[in-house]
Amino acid sequence: MSQKNYILAFDTANEIIAVGVGKLERETATIKVLASCETPAFRASNTKLIAKIDAALEDAGVAKSELACVACGRGPGSFTGVRICTATAKGIALGLDLPLFGVSTLDAQAWDQWAKGARGEVVVLGDAMRI
């Protein structure tokens, strides 16, 4: 049996739907991004997320049966956005019998800055959307 080598990751905690498909590089413990998209979706994640996931998988040339795991953003962020993300991820993971991992949205943003070369302290700020 061949080893599954792809990860599906997405987040809807904020006003953007972020979706990515990556190849697990087991030898180097890294992930090579094959397809990704960020789409504005102010209060519309529930109507756009599945289509964006399907499009990312198609762009990457990866079938759902080739996925090794699912990762989803777990906030902080919009309460409804986090619930949409978590419920979708749980449904996909259960339906495909895959492990599911929750990732802090703040950690993901900080690690993105590290990958872009930032060193030292990194502070992630987010709009609390309160007036």
Predicted regions, residues:
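Nucleotide and nucleotide-moiety/phosphate-recognizing core
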Residues: 2-8, 17-131
